[in-house]
Amino acid sequence: MDYVLGKQQAVLLHADGVLAESRQDIIRCFCAQASMNPRLGKPVGHIALSYSVNDAPKLTDEKMIQLAQEYMREMKITDTQYIIVRHQDREHPHVHIVFNRIDNNGKTISDRNDMYRNEQVCKKLKAKHGLYFAKGKEQVKRHRLKEPDKSKYEIYTAVR
């Protein structure tokens, strides 16, 4: 929560199922719901949805909320507490979704196969909303990569 809400240019766009007056209120609400299933080791999920700079003009706060909620539905992250926070610390538009993996009925929201589902859902939403598709590895900001991705891109550059 500190990373998502603590940044200077962070804006809480939407909250559902939590008191959103302060960061502490949000944390208390998440903890109360997480106590319905204390065996779950990682009760909070975090997803960052990043978009191309090319899409910035059409990504209003309302559109970012709509895309985040649609993403959550497609990923089966429903019936639970969540917040959507927009960061404006980078040139590309992006939001962070923080959600309780214990739903409102005490059931665990699975994170199984998330990487595969995430890829499919992102492609679907980009196509549906006419968002920019990067043309492969050429658009990657290599100076910002960390290992092991940095080495992968160095190899890619050397081989091509």
Cite the ranges covered by each PLM segment.
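N-terminal nicking endonuclease/strand-transfer module with a His-rich metal-binding environment
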Residues: M1-R160
